[in-house]
Amino acid sequence: MRKHKIGIYEKALPKNISWQDRLSIAKACGFDFVEISIDETDERLARLDWTKKERIKLAKAIISTGITIPSMCLSAHRRFPFGSRDETTRQKAYEVMEKAIQLAVDLGIRTIQIAGYDVYYEEQDEGTIARFQQGMEWAVALAASNQVTLAVEIMDTKFMSSISRWKKWDELIRSPWFTVYPDLGNLSAWNDNVAEELKLGIDKISAIHLKDTYKVTETCQGQFRDVPFGEGCVDFAQCFKTLAALNYRGAF
């Protein structure tokens, strides 16, 4: 029996199939779990309004296949950020968060990975950061009351580009229900000291994403998607050695 649970992101599986089939494929491929996506598309946002019957159907598929959905990648806040200048957009951000937590409760999802963006399609300023903080404080309080963990992804933008940067938010929010969900690709693209970053956050890492990236330099903006494993900047062997030395026992 391996020490770590190994999961697959929903978007790595066929799109237009049932959840029963999706979980069955993951099982046949040797994965332990699937991470569900609630992104900024209307199609996946609609999952937040699934009926009781639809939720029960997925719960039954989880039980019948033995493949769990312990985590949700909630990237919808890229479209509806807490830090937005637009009040309607901010209201939608709160609504999305509330519905996502309820969906997590219903499906047994323990960790919601949230995007570390104060804003994405707007310019950042002190106001966007302040509103993001208000949103995070509210969201973590709601998640905590439902025993759901909110884990911030290390992102493809500088605002949340390292565990060091996330740590400043951890010191502000100060909750066991507010953790970090590093992506080794994003972390490596922005930072030369990946081992030190992992050491800094080891006590609050909920899970880890694995992908390769091209590094951000003075002459290159980096590439955060669609980089074949082994062709990018991530030193996977060294990352795994560091995590083993830190006694990391979470999922990948």
Task: For the regions a language model picked out, list residue spans one by one.
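Active-site beta-loop-alpha junctions enriched in small/polar residues
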Residues: Y9-L13, S37-T41, L74-H77, Y117-V119, ...
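A structural motif
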Residues: F31, I67, A104, I109, ...
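Conserved, mostly hydrophobic/aromatic
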Residues: I8, A26, V34, I62, ...
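Hydrophobic faces of well-ordered beta-strands that scaffold small-molecule active sites
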Residues: H4-E10, V34-I36, I69-L74, I112-I114, ...
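Active-site acidic/histidine proton-transfer and metal-coordination neighborhood
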Residues: Q20-D21, K27, A61-T65, F80-V180
